[in-house]
């Protein structure tokens, strides 16, 4: 059996188009097609807690993942039958770093540091202490001071700094040393028996840098800040230079921002996935075209239309399908939204709706002519 692919992706400004750049209209639709493939195991890796991940899935119509690594790597959920099951063994794995102290106890050690402002209670958990800070904060000098205080208590921690460019605010997460995106991904890989050659990560911001430069196959979407791009390249060891892909746009007519960049990078590492993005299936070219055909009929004149998604598909429409449908009267290059139902439309309404995206053939039993 062919090895499956583990696609791990950050959410905000990676899959979610909630930055300043414009999203390619077809990108998330192609992501949905890809996620339907049994050969793809999808894991969201986010700073969000469970409720916010679920909210993002609903708001942006994202595919339901197989796994979710939340709270910047401090929680792991397995999703089956729409039920979210936490991995308690992951909590045990990371708990030893904090010597039994929870996030509230740690916060007392930093009460006098005025640039830091505690985030809302729902953004904290037992193993995640999160602060807001000015985006211009000199974090490179501050973090060693914080680490020194924790080390004096025998506490091992990691510090994740990033900037929310939309809200223009700095974000600082303090976690058990083992609790980070990279370790959580590796824990997931080990438990689900994925090797490095069948795993890929996508991200955009400072809290993704450790994974981006880890040697795992990784994608940096095109909308990432330039300083993140430069820092990722600086951290990347020479022997891992081929493991990081910088999305640049142009793939399948997409712009490389957000999910478009994820798809572009995935196809770079796994070329076979391009066909899955187009059709969601693994059939031959003719079978793919047959599966993507749709018949639309107007109710008043009984006009019929055969829709295919791209012009190239016309040359691959199987002969048997054409025989079933009858001969073709004429061909026009028009555009269609496939999700629109035309079952009750008249001819004029059909023509208007078909002028948006795609290609169609009007069907007739009399003659065949191209225009």
Curated annotation (Swiss-Prot):
GO MF terms, alphabetically ordered: magnesium ion binding; phosphatase activity
NCBIfam families per the UniProt record, alphabetical: HAD-SF-IIB
HAMAP family given in the database record: UPF0745 (MF_01866)
Alphabetical list of CDD domains matching this protein: HAD_SPP (cd02605)
Keywords linked to the UniProt accession: Hydrolase
InterPro entries: HAD-like_sf (IPR036412), HAD-SF_hydro_IIB (IPR006379), HAD_sf (IPR023214), SPP-like_dom (IPR006380), Sucrose_Phosphatase (IPR051518), YcgL-like_sf (IPR038068), YcgL_dom (IPR027354)
Family of this protein: In the N-terminal section; belongs to the HAD-like hydrolase superfamily.
YcgL domain ranges (all copies): 291-371
Protein name in the entry: Putative HAD-like hydrolase Noc_2718
One Pfam entry name: YcgL
Lineage, broadest ranks: Bacteria, Pseudomonadati, Pseudomonadota, Gammaproteobacteria, Chromatiales
Region of interest (HAD-like hydrolase), residue spans: 1-288
Enzyme Commission code(s) on record: 3.-.-.-
């Amino acid at each position: 059996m062919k090895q499956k692919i583990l696609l791990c992706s950050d959410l905000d400004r990676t899959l979610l188009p909630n930055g300043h750049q414009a999203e390619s209209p077809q990108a998330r639709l192609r992501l949905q097609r890809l996620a339907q493939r049994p050969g793809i195991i999808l894991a969201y890796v986010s700073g969000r807690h469970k409720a916010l991940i679920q909210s993002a899935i609903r708001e942006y119509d994202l595919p339901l993942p197989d796994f979710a690594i939340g709270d910047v790597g401090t929680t792991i959920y397995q999703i089956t039958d729409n039920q979210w099951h936490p991995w308690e063994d992951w909590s045990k794995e990371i708990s030893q770093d904090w010597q039994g102290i929870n996030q509230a106890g740690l916060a007392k050690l930093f009460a006098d540091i005025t640039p830091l402002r505690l985030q809302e209670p729902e953004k904290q958990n037992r193993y995640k202490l999160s602060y807001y800070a000015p985006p211009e904060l000199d974090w490179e000098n501050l973090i060693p001071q914080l680490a020194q205080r924790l080390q004096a208590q025998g506490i091992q921690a990691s510090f994740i700094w990033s900037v929310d460019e939309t809200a223009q605010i700095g974000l600082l997460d303090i976690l058990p040393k083992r609790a980070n995106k990279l370790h959580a991904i590796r824990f997931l890989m080990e438990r689900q028996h994925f090797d490095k050659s069948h795993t890929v990560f996508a991200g955009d911001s400072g809290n993704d840098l450790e994974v981006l430069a880890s040697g795992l196959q990784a994608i940096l979407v095109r909308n990432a800040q330039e300083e993140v791009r430069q820092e990722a390249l600086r951290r990347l060891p020479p022997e891992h230079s081929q493991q990081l892909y910088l999305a640049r746009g142009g793939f399948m007519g997409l712009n490389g921002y957000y999910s478009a960049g994820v798809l572009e990078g995935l196809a770079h590492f796994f070329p076979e996935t391009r066909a899955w993005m187009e059709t969601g299936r693994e059939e031959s070219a003719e079978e793919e075209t047959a599966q993507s055909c749709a018949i639309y009929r107007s109710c008043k004149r009984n006009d019929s239309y055969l829709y295919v998604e791209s012009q190239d598909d016309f040359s691959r429409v199987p002969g048997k399908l054409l025989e079933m449908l009858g001969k073709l009267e004429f061909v026009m290059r028009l555009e269609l939204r496939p999700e629109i139902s035309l079952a009750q439309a008249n001819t004029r309404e059909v023509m208007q709706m078909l002028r948006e995206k795609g290609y169609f053939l009007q069907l007739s039993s009399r003659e065949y002519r191209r225009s």
